[in-house]
Amino acid sequence: MNSLAAVRSEPSPAQNRPQSRAFPSAAPGPRLDALTGLRWIAAFAVFVYHARLFLPLPHMTHVAPMGNTGVTFFFVLSGFVLTWSFVKTDTAPRFYWRRFARIWPALAVSTVLAIPVFYYGRGIPFDAMSQLGVLASLTFVQSWFPSIMFAGNPAAWSLSNEAFFYLLFPFLIRPLLRLRVRWLALLAVALVTFNIGLRWWGYGADLTAVQATYLFISPIGRLAEFVLGMTGAAAMRRGWRVPVPVSLATVAVGVVLAIIWYDSSHPDLLSSVGTESPLANGMNQLMGALYALLIVAVATRELTGKPMFLRTRLMVTLGTWSYSFYLIHATVLYGLSEIWFGRQPPSWSNVPPLLLSLAIAIGLSAALYRLVEHPAEKALRSMLTRPSARTVSTAPPRNERAS
């Protein structure tokens, strides 16, 4: 969910040469700043998705909801970055501690800020059940229980999924890195096919709300997206480079989003039992594959050293704050709606309060990053340093913090 600034170092020529060993390098891959910038775009898309509830713009009714696929992007990116930065000598306990240090401090503070907005501000009693939901959120288990999935800080539900992915990562990474590129390609195709097939089956099945949640939202239902990101990074660590330019990958993402938009903007295409047609349903699942394509295309281009807008100081800075932004943006939107603008009809007059809400969310995310996320992560990571080895660097694997 991004702290994304890692220790800067230049890749050696050996790091960029195709390799064929089971573990191409014991060291992590070179830092990929463009992925940090790309992460900001996904976080902004999620902001737009939630902002549409309060400050919709004309002709954007069916466009803004597509921002929800930004979460899919996060899951794919997480698998990619953790695999790209994996060090052969790393241990599961150290990995778990680094991930805890990475995501928990900002989660805790953002949850404290969210409680007045999502409970007292909306007239929801903060009783024992609500407190249990907050505890579940702070311990990364809320997405296993549909009734409390959005407890505490609602945006944090995806962290429960991420925590499950982190739990499995040490057991998945070594077998995955032993696979040759052809087998990784087959695995990627199988993951995408499984995702689309599962969604289409679920669309036509008579599922209860609980069953649908486990199928489409729970950690089990989203695991394939994380593993898909892992396969892309594993292939690149073996020297594979996608022969698709960033521009073409971007167009592919845009085309599928346009299909989803067209489909959702024509009610006659919708099923009487859902808000999406089978076409939109399948296209939504295809987004995971296209985001994986976009990520490896961006990574491939950056490894060539060519300039990219995503690597500019502005984009990298915003990407660095994006985890805090993701955690705080919904609290800002819901909070301002309670004390100021409420829920407005579509209008261009919503632009000023929308921009102000965005500015406030960015400002608070910068503060949360500088005052909590970064210093707390640094302090917690320092506990991994053994007293007898203070001169040995304990910096995280380069680029791991982008996940």
Predicted feature locations:
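C-terminal "closing" transmembrane helix and its immediate cytosolic amphipathic cap
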Residues: 1-25, 308-315, 330-403
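Functional transmembrane helices that form membrane-embedded active or gating regions
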Residues: 24-44, 62, 95-97, 102-104, ...
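Functionally critical transmembrane alpha-helices in membrane proteins and complexes, commonly lining
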Residues: 30-87, 104-111, 132-146, 152-154, ...
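Transmembrane alpha-helical segments and their boundary/interface "anchor" motifs
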Residues: 39, 68-75, 86-120, 128-137, ...
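Membrane-water interface at transmembrane helix exits
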Residues: 52, 83-87, 114-118, 122, ...
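Alpha-helical transmembrane segments of polytopic integral membrane proteins
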Residues: 76-79, 83, 169, 229, ...
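Juxtamembrane interface at the ends
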Residues: 204, 292-308
